[in-house]
């Protein structure tokens, strides 16, 4: 057995640790370093060389109690985490250690969290829609199977609830595996999600990885890679179509910014790290469809101060196939999910992929909503009566469309009092087609609110 490469802790600045090794024995960048003495058990990752014999590392755990002079051992490899079916139904931290109190994981395979993205010859273009059962998404900004989707929104507009609904729908309707990665979000939400999944039985097909708000920046920066590594194994070795949820990708950037400052790098625009685009690219390029399987990724993106031009959301935009924008203006109207039908976009809303009928209905719906938006100023100043008959009709149809875009969620039944609905794409298209063709003109607006299919609207209207 080779002798251990042992170093000594020489400096500690918060989560950043400088470790001195013998000359010629410096560990490689990204190697995991273990510090295990005097009741301290820390794993750190090598980030940079600061001299001929010293490496600067970022700790994945709290550095409380760490002292200069403590021994540190180079493991000779990056952080490795368990993969395979054994991780389903369990909760892990960034190091792949179970944190759900259910004992050890019986995994036989462990993989490093730092890996190359699949080569161009292994990748597969995506032209298939993933049916989510959520009307506003399936109609106006459909998700591509194996695509990357961004959920954009400020604080408290419903990003996490939408993610929970997607996990529930994919597990129960498609029977696929999901990996949920909680990056720098509230522990309470993680606990809610865990309890929700146990109650609904979804947990059996999901692995959860958490590096929450109270964790050091090193943990929050790497936890996304831990979840991604588990998802990659399902794709590459088991040939699965996997769903990878990242809540919240902004916190990954934020943690990178903290680490960058601690490492002494000069900040870039708005104080972000100069390596922002590189770090984001390294993570996003691994999320892709290959000839073996696919990873469809849904990433919640917190938008600081609702400013979409901030470098963090702006860098994320470049990697996405679809964007689901959640709007505070729609929340104020009491319409949930608060997806903005005009701001949300998708690369697969294309005649060649979704077909003529879907494309035509979607564009007509957006056209009516856009015209209604333009008319709102006139209505505010002159009143509804000053509009032409044609414009009045557009306003009435637009208001029905807005209400029909709302939908009761399974995971929010306790809050809304409405039973959750999963709506097939064909029913969604049929419903909106009837509204835009004028077949629903004599039905009151209230019948459309929180309805599933158009048939339910007819039933409600009869009782009114």
UniProtKB/Swiss-Prot annotation:
UniProt topology in membrane: Peripheral membrane protein
Record's keyword annotation contains Iron: no
Main location as per UniProt: membrane
Record keywords: ATP synthesis, ATP-binding, Cell membrane, CF(1), Hydrogen ion transport, Ion transport, Membrane, Nucleotide-binding, Translocase, Transport
Subcellular location: Cell membrane
Keyword Zinc-finger tagged: no
Molecular function per GO: ATP binding; ATP hydrolysis activity; proton-transporting ATP synthase activity, rotational mechanism
Superkingdom, natural source: Bacteria
Binding annotation for ATP: 153-160
InterPro entries xrefs: AAA+_ATPase (IPR003593), ATP-synt_VA_C (IPR055190), ATP_synth_F1_bsu (IPR005722), ATPase_a/bsu_AS (IPR020003), ATPase_alpha/beta_chains (IPR050053), ATPase_F1/V1/A1_a/bsu_N (IPR004100), ATPase_F1/V1/A1_a/bsu_N_sf (IPR036121), ATPase_F1/V1/A1_a/bsu_nucl-bd (IPR000194)
EC number: 7.1.2.2
PROSITE patterns, per database record: ATPASE_ALPHA_BETA
Family of the protein in this entry: Belongs to the ATPase alpha/beta chains family.
Function recorded in the entry: Produces ATP from ADP in the presence of a proton gradient across the membrane. The catalytic sites are hosted primarily by the beta subunits.
PANTHER family recorded: ATP SYNTHASE, ATP SYNTHASE SUBUNIT BETA, MITOCHONDRIAL
Subunit note: F-type ATPases have 2 components, CF(1) - the catalytic core - and CF(0) - the membrane proton channel. CF(1) has five subunits: alpha(3), beta(3), gamma(1), delta(1), epsilon(1). CF(0) has three main subunits: a(1), b(2) and c(9-12). The alpha and beta chains form an alternating ring which encloses part of the gamma chain. CF(1) is attached to CF(0) by a central stalk formed by the gamma and epsilon chains, while a peripheral stalk is formed by the delta and b chains.
Name used for this protein in its record: ATP synthase subunit beta
Source organism per UniProt: Acetivibrio thermocellus (strain ATCC 27405 / DSM 1237 / JCM 9322 / NBRC 103400 / NCIMB 10682 / NRRL B-4536 / VPI 7372) (Clostridium thermocellum)
């Amino acid at each position: 057995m080779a002798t251990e490469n042992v170093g000594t802790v020489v400096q500690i600045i918060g989560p950043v640790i400088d470790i001195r090794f013998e000359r010629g024995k410096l560990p490689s960048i990204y190697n995991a370093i273990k510090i295990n003495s005097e009741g301290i058990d820390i794993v750190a990752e090598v980030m940079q060389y600061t001299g001929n014999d010293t490496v600067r590392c970022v700790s994945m755990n709290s550095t409380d109690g760490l002292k200069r002079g403590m021994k540190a051992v180079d493991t000779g490899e990056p952080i490795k985490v368990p993969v395979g079916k054994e991780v389903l139904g369990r909760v892990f931290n960034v190091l792949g250690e179970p944190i759900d109190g259910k004992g050890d994981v019986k995994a036989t395979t462990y993989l490093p969290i730092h890996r190359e993205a699949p080569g161009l010859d292994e990748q597969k273009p995506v032209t298939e829609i993933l049916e989510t059962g959520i009307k506003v998404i399936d109609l106006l900004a459909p998700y591509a199977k194996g695509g990357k989707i961004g959920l954009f929104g400020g604080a408290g507009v419903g990003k996490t609830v939408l993610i929970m609904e997607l996990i529930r729908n994919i597990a129960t309707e498609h029977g696929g595996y999901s990996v949920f990665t909680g990056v720098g979000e509230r522990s309470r939400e993680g606990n809610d999600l865990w309890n929700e999944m146990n109650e609904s039985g979804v947990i059996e097909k999901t692995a959860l990885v958490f590096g929450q708000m109270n964790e050091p920046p090193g943990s929050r920066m790497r936890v996304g890679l831990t979840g991604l590594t588990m998802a990659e194994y399902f794709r590459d070795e088991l040939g699965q179509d996997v769903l990878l949820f990242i809540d919240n990708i902004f916190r990954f950037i934020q943690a990178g910014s903290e680490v960058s400052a601690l490492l002494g790098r000069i900040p870039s625009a708005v104080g972000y790290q100069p390596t922002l685009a590189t770090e984001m690219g390294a993570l996003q390029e691994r999320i892709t469809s290959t000839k073996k399987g696919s990873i469809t990724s849904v990433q919640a993106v917190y938008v600081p101060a609702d400013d979409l031009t901030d470098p963090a959301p702006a860098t994320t935009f470049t990697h996405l196939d679809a964007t689901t924008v959640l709007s505070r203006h729609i929340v104020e109207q009491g319409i949930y999910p608060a997806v903005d039908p005009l701001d949300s976009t998708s690369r697969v809303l294309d005649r060649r992929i979704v077909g003529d009928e879907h494309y035509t209905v979607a564009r007509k719906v957006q056209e009516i909503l856009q015209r209604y938006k333009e008319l709102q100023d006139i209505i505010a100043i002159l009143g509804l009566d000053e509009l032409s008959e044609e414009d009045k009709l557009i306003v009435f149809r637009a208001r029905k469309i807005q209400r029909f875009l709302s939908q009761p969620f399974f995971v929010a039944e306790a809050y809304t009092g409405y039973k959750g609905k999963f709506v097939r794409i064909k029913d969604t298209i049929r419903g909106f087609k009837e509204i835009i063709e004028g077949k629903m003109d004599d039905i009151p607006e209230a019948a459309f609110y929180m309805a599933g299919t158009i048939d339910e609207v007819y039933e409600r209207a009869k009782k009114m």
